[in-house]
């Protein structure tokens, strides 16, 4: 280990200062004069002479060459107990010594310590000297840093990471499942590499591309791929790095960022989580955040202001496009908005193929089957799924990832960590009836999603779980599907009521009832699926804290509000009645399924449907996606 004299100096100076201060304090407190030259109060010289004449003075100690006296006296004014009093003596008082001797007062004179002023002077000067020396040393060190002199005060400089040739290790080959977004950015890269092909027909390079989509869908990964493919200087910064505690820092950093970008154009500037600085300006409460709005105004000016920024492509990512300012979204700033959504089954298969490259998978594993089992999973979810499976494989000391680890990983990603298995008891049987109630309703309703698995293995906060496989296209949902989902959610509570009676129903259906109420209310207020008619009665939820105004929410009369509540109650009551009847009609198969579930703890969807099919006819599930395509 190399020893630096600078490090030694930085260590010894504070230690020396602390040691000196401790020594000086200890020296003062142990000095006898320090303790003697202390008084609880003061007294005038005239009053002191009166005390002396009355015989109340017991002892006098003279200090400062006879100019100060510490008097020990007693008297009614002092509470009839001896106290130490400080008295300032006049320069000429020759009669005082005579009076003290006549009164038989104990007198003592103390010599002045000549070394005290010198040490006091050193003690007063050493701290400022060391402070100035330390600051000079710090500024000297900062002058040797890449930023040059004054680096410590460069608050207004941009914190963007700059790469002349970005080496992110990510290319377009590593991006899968978002083909539309990928094509858009491949075109941007082509624009940078071969601009003449586009300018020949009068095309201009896009000034900005905004990536919009849910978390985990690959927005930042796309930006890394562009950086790796473009071959031009690349700046990357987070939206939260603009605004800090000093006023004006945000706007200054925006100016500095675009100044550097213009010096290195053509180039790409990537702003991640742009909603941190680009939220909509508005009234709000208290007029909004002036510092953030000042930063946003500067960003708008730099992106498409009077001077322009030819040769700079701005790429930004956000999952909160609804709160961005309208001026930021217009063409000329962000010419393109690319939606990076959750992948479909084809996209999920491509993503799984990418993340499975470095995984040792058993030959029996079908990535296509995994893709079909994971609707709604984002790219990050799928990457996490395979990583969890690999970790579980290593924990089990296996050489390859099998379908068992894949199943456990899917369950963990969806519902959380696996808990301890329940012991055989009334609680376990009640949970079994609850879960079978969900599953039997989902199986016997034509418009409900098919059952994927029923389990009593606790995960997260849930003691038991029932998985359904939703259809691939969830953008259009019919009224029959919503009613089927309401009945499926009520299946657990209905099974508890039928089997154990109303007094024995539990709180396990609390979350189910929240979902049921939410779906029924949306049917009435949002989708117009009730007797009130095709009306949208939902408030716009304009939040003033997001820069929106406070007076834009829709209003309706108390009569309509009462009718909404009645319709919600009627929908839920109707679904509950039908659900209870289905449970009663299929009590025999439910009892059999509960016994099997308690024995095996997990029943997959195919086995569940096969057992139910032995007792009753199963409806043919409707694929609304194929119906929509045929029309």
Swiss-Prot record:
The chain crosses the membrane at residues 3-23, 119-139. Pfam families: AAA, AAA_lid_3, FtsH_ext, Peptidase_M41. Binds 1 zinc ion per subunit. GO terms for cellular component: chloroplast thylakoid membrane. Keywords: ATP-binding, Chloroplast, Hydrolase, Membrane, Metal-binding, Metalloprotease, Nucleotide-binding, Plastid, Protease, Thylakoid, Transmembrane, Transmembrane helix, Zinc. CDD domains: RecA-like_FtsH. Its cofactor is Zn(2+). Homohexamer. This is ATP-dependent zinc metalloprotease FtsH. It comes from Guillardia theta. The gene is ftsH.
């Amino acid at each position: 280990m190399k020893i630096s004299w600078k490090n030694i100096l930085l260590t010894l100076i504070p230690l020396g200062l602390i040691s000196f201060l401790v020594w000086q304090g200890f020296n003062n407190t142990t000095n006898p004069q320090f303790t003697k030259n202390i008084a609880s109060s003061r007294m005038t010289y005239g009053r002191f002479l009166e005390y002396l004449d009355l015989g109340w003075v017991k002892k006098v100690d003279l200090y400062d060459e006879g100019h100060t006296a510490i008097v020990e006296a007693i008297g009614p004014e002092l509470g009839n107990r001896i106290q130490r009093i400080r008295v300032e003596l006049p320069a000429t008082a020759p009669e005082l010594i005579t009076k003290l001797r006549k009164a038989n007062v104990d007198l003592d004179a103390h010599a002045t310590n000549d070394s005290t002023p010198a040490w006091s002077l050193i003690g007063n000067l050493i701290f400022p000297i060391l402070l100035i020396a330390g600051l000079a040393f710090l500024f000297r060190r900062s002058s040797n840093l890449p930023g040059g002199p004054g680096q410590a005060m460069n608050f207004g400089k941009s914190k963007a990471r700059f790469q002349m040739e970005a080496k992110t290790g990510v290319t377009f080959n590593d991006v899968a499942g978002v083909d539309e977004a990928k094509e858009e950015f491949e075109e941007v890269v082509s624009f940078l590499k071969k601009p003449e092909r586009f300018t020949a027909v009068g095309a201009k390079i896009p000034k900005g591309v905004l990536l919009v989509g849910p978390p985990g869908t690959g927005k930042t990964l796309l930006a890394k791929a562009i950086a790796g493919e473009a071959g031009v200087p690349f700046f990357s910064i987070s939206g939260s790095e603009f605004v800090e505690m000093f006023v004006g820092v945000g706007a200054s950093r925006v100016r500095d960022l675009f100044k550097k970008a213009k010096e290195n154009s053509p180039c790409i500037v990537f702003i991640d989580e742009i909603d941190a600085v680009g939220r909509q300006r508005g009234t709000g409460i208290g007029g909004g955040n002036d510092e953030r709005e000042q930063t946003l105004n500067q960003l708008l000016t730099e992106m498409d202001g009077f001077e322009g920024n030819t040769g700079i492509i701005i790429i930004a990512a956000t999952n909160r496009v609804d709160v961005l300012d309208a001026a930021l979204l217009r063409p000329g700033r962000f010419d393109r908005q690319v939606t990076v959504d959750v992948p479909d089954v084809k996209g999920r298969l491509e993503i799984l193929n990418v993340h499975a490259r470095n995984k040792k998978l058993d030959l029996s594993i079908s990535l296509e089957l995994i893709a079909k089992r994971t609707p709604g999973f984002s790219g990050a979810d799928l990457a996490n799924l395979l990583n969890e499976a690999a970790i579980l494989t290593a924990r089990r000391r296996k050489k390859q990832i099998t379908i068992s680890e894949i199943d456990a990983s899917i369950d963990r990603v969806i519902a959380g960590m696996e808990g301890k298995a329940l012991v055989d008891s009334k609680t376990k049987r009640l949970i079994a009836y609850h879960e079978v109630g969900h599953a039997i309703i989902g199986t016997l309703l034509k418009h409900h999603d098919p059952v994927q698995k029923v389990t009593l293995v606790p995960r997260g906060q849930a003691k038991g779980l029932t998985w359904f496989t939703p259809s691939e296209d969830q953008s259009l949902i019919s009224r029959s599907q919503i009613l089927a989902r309401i009945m499926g959610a009520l299946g657990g509570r209905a099974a508890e009521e039928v089997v154990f009676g109303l007094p024995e129903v539990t709180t396990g259906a609390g979350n189910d009832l929240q979902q049921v109420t939410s779906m029924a209310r949306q049917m009435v207020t949002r989708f117009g699926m009730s007797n009130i008619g095709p009306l949208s009665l939902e408030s716009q939820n304009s939040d003033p804290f997001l820069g929106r105004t406070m007076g834009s929410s829709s209003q309706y009369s108390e009569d309509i509000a009462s009718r909404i509540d009645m319709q919600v109650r009627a929908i839920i009551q109707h679904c509950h009645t039908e659900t209870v009847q289905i449970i009663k009609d299929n009590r025999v198969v439910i009892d059999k399924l509960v016994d099997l579930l308690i024995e095996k703890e997990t029943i997959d969807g195919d086995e569940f449907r096969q057992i139910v099919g032995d007792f009753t006819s199963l409806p043919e599930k409707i694929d609304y996606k194929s119906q929509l395509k045929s029309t």
